[in-house]
């Protein structure tokens, strides 16, 4: 009887919608104070994962020195993704490295953040036009919170990116944290590449189609003849 009394233009509420009591409780004075304290503790102890694949990582390594001293921001470099909540992708990401990067990101505990450092990480950089193995943007693999352009960015720019990330962490709310979990931030698309056996096996010197150079050439250049070619020299000469 209640449904029939409603007009057709008036939408019905979903039966599984969140309770208004829970939404009001998230805006409670005590909980908001605890939320600010929780965000302050997290933004003061960001532990980055060392992930450098190219020349941009050299600029990031300059921050470890006493001149810039990024320890004052609470940044403690970690070598394990299970102990890090920030990953700074510094350098080019290739197709072969993409599954490993996604695996490292999935192993990081929530909440976690990503800083894309350098042109090669953001758009592919100078490899984006004629490279067959470069990923055109790391945001196709993992979600990015702060983009840091440059080739390479200066250490001062990296510090500015960390400060912007700290501001973002400080403004997060408890009710919004459900929407930034790992299952809601990106969708993993499995590639369609077919793994094949490697072409360069190291046995090309023993191939039947290889023509051995004459012994006079090796003797004149004072080079040692490989043992794998000695049999061919004996047969030919």
From Swiss-Prot:
GO terms for biological process: aerobic respiration; electron transport coupled proton transport; photosynthesis, light reaction. NDH shuttles electrons from NAD(P)H:plastoquinone, via FMN and iron-sulfur (Fe-S) centers, to quinones in the photosynthetic chain and possibly in a chloroplast respiratory chain. The immediate electron acceptor for the enzyme in this species is believed to be plastoquinone. Couples the redox reaction to proton translocation, and thus conserves the redox energy in a proton gradient. Binds 1 [4Fe-4S] cluster. GO terms for cellular component: chloroplast thylakoid membrane; respiratory chain complex I. GO terms for molecular function: 4 iron, 4 sulfur cluster binding; iron ion binding; NADH dehydrogenase (ubiquinone) activity; quinone binding. This is NAD(P)H-quinone oxidoreductase subunit K, chloroplastic. [4Fe-4S] cluster binds at residues 55-56, 120, 151. InterPro entries: NADH_UbQ_OxRdtase-like_20kDa (IPR006137), NADH_UQ_OxRdtase_20Kd_su (IPR006138). Its cofactor is [4Fe-4S] cluster. It catalyses: a plastoquinone + NADH + (n+1) H(+)(in) = a plastoquinol + NAD(+) + n H(+)(out); a plastoquinone + NADPH + (n+1) H(+)(in) = a plastoquinol + NADP(+) + n H(+)(out). It is a peripheral membrane protein. The keyword Isomerase does not apply. It is found in: Plastid, Chloroplast thylakoid membrane. It comes from Nephroselmis olivacea. It is an enzyme of class 7 (translocase). SUPFAM superfamilies: HydA/Nqo6-like. The keyword Ubl conjugation does not apply. HAMAP family: NDH1_NuoB. Its EC number is 7.1.1.-. Belongs to the complex I 20 kDa subunit family. NDH is composed of at least 16 different subunits, 5 of which are encoded in the nucleus. Keywords: 4Fe-4S, Chloroplast, Iron, Iron-sulfur, Membrane, Metal-binding, NAD, NADP, Plastid, Plastoquinone, Quinone, Thylakoid, Translocase, Transport.
